[in-house]
Amino acid sequence: MAKKSMIAKAARKPKFKVRAYTRCQICGRPHSVYRDFGICRVCLRKMGNEGLIPGLKKASW
């Protein structure tokens, strides 16, 4: 889990737009965030397996 201070810091608008970065909306993780869903790979996998994301299903080939 991310610190509350880091989540608050990320929520502020940066002075320069290139400094902005995505953070998971659920757990606050800063890396591997899928922009389409706004959540990280860990939360995406967990919610996908539980069937909470419509249209998302596990690949099998």
From Swiss-Prot:
Per the record, its GO cellular-component terms are:
cytoplasm; small ribosomal subunit
Q: Which InterPro entries match?
A: Ribosomal_uS14 (IPR001209), Ribosomal_uS14_bact (IPR023053), Ribosomal_uS14_CS (IPR018271), Ribosomal_uS14_sf (IPR043140)
Cofactor(s) listed in the protein's UniProt record? Zn(2+)
Q: Name one Pfam family in it.
A: Ribosomal_S14
Judging by the UniProt lineage, the source's domain of life is Bacteria
Q: What PROSITE patterns does the entry give?
A: RIBOSOMAL_S14
Keyword Disulfide bond attributed = no
UniProt KW keywords: Metal-binding, Ribonucleoprotein, Ribosomal protein, RNA-binding, rRNA-binding, Zinc
Q: How is the cofactor bound?
A: Binds 1 zinc ion per subunit.
Which amino acids does the record list as binding Zn(2+)? 24, 27, 40, 43
For this entry, list what GO says about its biological process. translation
Listed GO molecular functions?
A: rRNA binding; structural constituent of ribosome; zinc ion binding
Keyword Acetylation among record annotations:
no
Q: Which family does it belong to?
A: Belongs to the universal ribosomal protein uS14 family. Zinc-binding uS14 subfamily.
Alphabetical list of PANTHER family matching this protein: 30S RIBOSOMAL PROTEIN S14, SMALL RIBOSOMAL SUBUNIT PROTEIN US14M
NCBIfam families referenced in this protein's UniProt entry, alphabetically: PRK08061.1
The protein's role, per its UniProt record: Binds 16S rRNA, required for the assembly of 30S particles and may also be responsible for determining the conformation of the 16S rRNA at the A site.
What assembly does the database describe for this protein?
A: Part of the 30S ribosomal subunit. Contacts proteins S3 and S10.
Protein name from the UniProt record = Small ribosomal subunit protein uS14
Species this chain originates from = Campylobacter jejuni subsp. jejuni serotype O:2 (strain ATCC 700819 / NCTC 11168)
Starting at the broadest rank, the lineage of the source organism is: Bacteria, Pseudomonadati, Campylobacterota, Epsilonproteobacteria, Campylobacterales
